[in-house]
C-alpha cells in the first residue's frame, strides 16, 4: 500500500480483520517464524525465480496463524495471487491476519467470528476485486471445496438444503440460499473454473474420498495430509506439543497424577497421549480399531471405553475425526471440574449441541463452565469445555510450532505447483492423489538442515543390494513409517 489511506480503504473493502494496528506485531512474529521454517523457506528460495505459480488465483481456507502467514507469502513469492480465510472460528491469530492484510493480501479472519461471519468469509474468498475467478483451492477440512460443490448442487435443486442436522448446517444452508437469490449460477460459475485443490487435514481428506466415490468431485485433489512429512510430523509431533500447551493456558491445571482419556489412537491421538504421559498423567485410550488399540496397549496405555471412563477420568481429549465420540450421557456422568476438549477438526466429536440446554458460564474466552443441575441424587456439578468443542490447540493456544508446520506447508506449496503445472495435461484426471515419495524425502532433507543432522550415504554396493538409487526414494510406497 502506498499510503495510510490506501491501506485503510483496502482493509475496509477487501478484508475483514480485527485490528490493522496489530500488523507490526504480526510482522515481528512472522520474522521469527521464518527462522524456524527451513523447508518452506528453502522451497521459496528454490522456485522464486521460476515463478511456477504465476497465473494462479488461490483461495485459501486454513487457520490464519503466524505460520500460515509464511505460507501465504511463499505462495505469493512464487507468483500466486491469494485470498484467505480461516477454517475455524477460533483459530485466527489477529496479529497474523493484520500483517497479511497490511501486505496487500485480502484476508477474512477474526478470532471468535460468528458462524454467520465464517460462511460469509468463505464466500468472499471466491470473489475477486476485478471480477475474476479462483482457479486453485488450498483447503483445510474441506469447507471451501464443500461450499462450491454443495452450492452448485443446490442450483439444480434446493431440496438438498431443506434438512440441516446442526446449527452450522442451518447457517450454511441459509447462506447458500441467500447467495442463490442474488446470483442463481454463483457456485457453478466458480466451480468450473477451479483446476484443483490441495487438502491439509484428515477430515478434509475423508470428505474428498467420499465425494470422489459418489462421483461428485469436479476437479483433481492432492491429499497433502497423507504425505509422511505431514501426517507423521504435524499430526503426531505437532499435537504432542500444542495439546498440553493449550490445556494449561486455558486451565492452569496440574496434569501430573490425573487420569487423562485420549479418544482415538491415530497419529493425533498418539501425539496427544505422549504429551499427557510426559507430564505424568495416567493415560487411557479409547479405540474402535483393534490394530490401533493394540498399539496403545503395547505402549503401556490402558485401553478402555468412554462408557467405562466417563465417571473416572479428569481430562478428556477427542482425537478421532468422528461424530459424537463424547456424548451428552458421557458428560452427565463426569466428575465435577472434568476438562473436555477436542483436537480433531470439527466440533461434532463432542456433543456440544446436547449440552446447550444447560447454563454456560464463560470463565474467559474459549473456556466455559457447563453447569449440570442436581439430578438422580447427585449434586450440581460443573465441567470445563474448551474452545466450545472446537480445535483446542488453536482455540486456546497458538497451534503447532513453526518448525513442524514448515513440513506441512512445504508439502502444500509443492502440491500446488504439481497440480498447477499439470493443467492442460492428463496427469491428474479427477481423483484424489498423494505426492510421490521423492518429494516427501525432499521435504525431510530440507527440514533436517535446521537440526544439524548428518545423513549417511549409501555406497553403490549397498544401493544395489537393496534395489534403490543412492539418491532415493529409499522406501516402497507401501512402507509404513
Curated annotation (Swiss-Prot):
Required co-factors: NAD(+)
Organism whose genome encodes this protein: Polynucleobacter necessarius subsp. necessarius (strain STIR1)
A Gene Ontology term for the protein's cellular component: cytosol
Enzyme Commission identifier(s): 3.13.2.1
Record-given protein name: Adenosylhomocysteinase
Residues holding substrate: 65, 140, 200, 230, 234
Chain segments annotated as coiled-coil in the UniProt record: none
Catalytic activity: S-adenosyl-L-homocysteine + H2O = L-homocysteine + adenosine
